[in-house]
Design a protein with these regions (language model features):
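Flexible, glycine/threonine- and acidic-rich loop/arm segments that mediate assembly and lattice contacts
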Residues: 1-210
């Protein structure tokens, strides 16, 4: 994630910021984090070659054992419990479910126990998070913008046993100065991470829902 700022822009008195370069660096760091989140959820593994950078296997791509294509079937409460049961039969115990906005609203309409709470030890839970009481235990429901995106032809759902997945960081994101050319200062944000999945059959994935 690279950026550059002209000397004129950096020297100017810009409202709302002390220095243009610092602002662009902060913005690039946020974009890097956003790209990393996208890759963790949706990327497909690619080996390094002359024309392609290496990439990791994402959360969606890593779940293969308990992966079901529903071919246009609407997500129901029974279907969700079937997903959880399939993972349970494989020795898993999913405790988190990730969906886009449409399936999140559908699950919120289920008749089973559905409440809200805040767990102060879980730093992801800034606001109250929905909790679904399933036949296989209590599940945290997370609305995630990259599960389903504009342009996708289906709606997907992913449920994981959270202690079987983790982000492994090789290099934390950091600012690196680039060689100056002309009347501009250049920099980039660089970092390396990957997704570790210890037992993907502990989790489930349902695709192609209406």
């Amino acid at each position: 994630m690279s950026f550059n700022v002209s000397a004129t822009a950096d020297a100017s008195n810009t409202a709302g910021m002390a220095k243009q370069y610092a602002y662009e660096m902060d913005k690039a760091m946020k974009e890097w984090s956003n790209d990393a989140e996208f890759a963790l959820m949706r990327s497909t593994v690619i080996s390094t070659s002359g024309s392609a950078l290496r990439s990791m296997t994402s959360l969606k791509a890593s779940i293969t054992t308990n992966a079901t294509s529903q071919s246009g079937v609407s997500l129901s409460e029974n279907t969700l419990n079937d997903y959880l049961g399939t993972a349970w039969d494989q020795g898993g115990n999913p405790d988190e479910v990730y969906v886009g906005k449409t399936l999140k609203r559908r699950i919120s309409g289920f008749t089973a126990g559905n409440t809200k709470f805040v767990d102060s030890t879980d730093k992801r839970l800034v606001n109250a998070v929905d909790v679904y009481e399933s036949d296989f235990g209590i599940i945290k429901l997370f609305k995630h913008r990259y599960i389903t995106q504009s342009g996708d032809n289906n709606l997907d759902i992913v449920g994981i046993q959270s202690d079987k997945f983790r982000v492994a960081t090789l290099r934390s994101p950091q600012h690196v100065s680039l060689a100056k050319t002309g009347d501009a200062t250049k920099g980039m944000i660089v970092g390396e991470l990957t997704l570790e999945f210890l037992a993907e059959n502990s989790s489930f994935k349902g695709t192609a829902h209406l």
